[in-house]
Amino acid sequence: MGRSRSRSPRRERRRSRSTSRDRERRRRERSRSRERDRRRSRSRSPHRRRSRSPRRHRSTSPSPSRLKERRDEEKKETKEIKNKERQITEEDLEGKTEEEIEMMKLMGFASFDSTKGKKVDGSVNAYAINVSQKRKYRQYMNRKGGFNRPLDFIA
């Protein structure tokens, strides 16, 4: 290692001209950062806006969820149109008793046919398969972070 060299007096003089300006600027920045630290809350949760009205974001392309919603709405509209088209016609009324005709007008159908093996629109075919999942255990004792903290999230 070489010996430390002191600055030349000329360089020191040149620096001294702007020191008062620099010192003032540094002091202002320091006070500003201190205020910012004081204002910052200690909570880790993301900052909530004061106004409850939703913010408007301008984006060129709609988000995937919006596209999906739009597609779902279009499907619903097409289904509604199909349902409207299926009105009771004169051909349907042929060979029916008055009671059956009355029932058709009230309920929208005349007979109690089975739908087994037929495709049915709507939520009629919304069934779920019983999926057995492996049980997830939560560790209560001997945890790394100690006891006084929330349990680990298990989805």
Swiss-Prot record:
InterPro entries membership: SNRNP27
Subcellular location: Nucleus
Compositional bias of kind Basic and acidic residues: 66-96
Signal sequence range: none
Basic residues composition-biased segments: 1-31, 39-59
Role this protein plays: May play a role in mRNA splicing.
Assembly with partners or alone: Part of a tri-snRNP complex.
Protein name: U4/U6.U5 small nuclear ribonucleoprotein 27 kDa protein
Organism, as annotated: Mus musculus (Mouse)
Gene name of this polypeptide: Snrnp27
